[in-house]
């Protein structure tokens, strides 16, 4: 159970937050990296995600604490990702905007952060900023080579992101409406308008 800003975050990808805790000696190895899961050998069993069985993790007490850790962790993750991927990463304006919007869509809508109101939406936005910061730090490590904005490509990207957001908003409304209103939002979801 992750306690963030004094609340248990049950959404936005923070619950259930499976962490291997009990394993036989010699069946686990840990590699260097931020938030890396261990490499396990042998049979793995997950416990049912019951709040009464979960460890309580007092994660972030304040926004300042989140930002401080964000700065430290994103520096490490930018190096890790650059080492793992080809050096010709995409740092175009379109890609940077997609990075933020897609992480937000994933956390707020697909992983239901919006269901926890300000807490869930705030963490969804902070996680989107986290992913953007990793990309910007990778760009920094590559020497800040600036790409010009391709107006057609950028416009196309924004239109695609608008459709995705329209889909997720309509999907959310479908879950909270009944009758004719639900039908209306189902049609909008299908059309992504």
Describe the predicted segments one by one.
Residues 1-145:
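Catalytic-site signature of metal-activated, phosphate-bearing donor transferases
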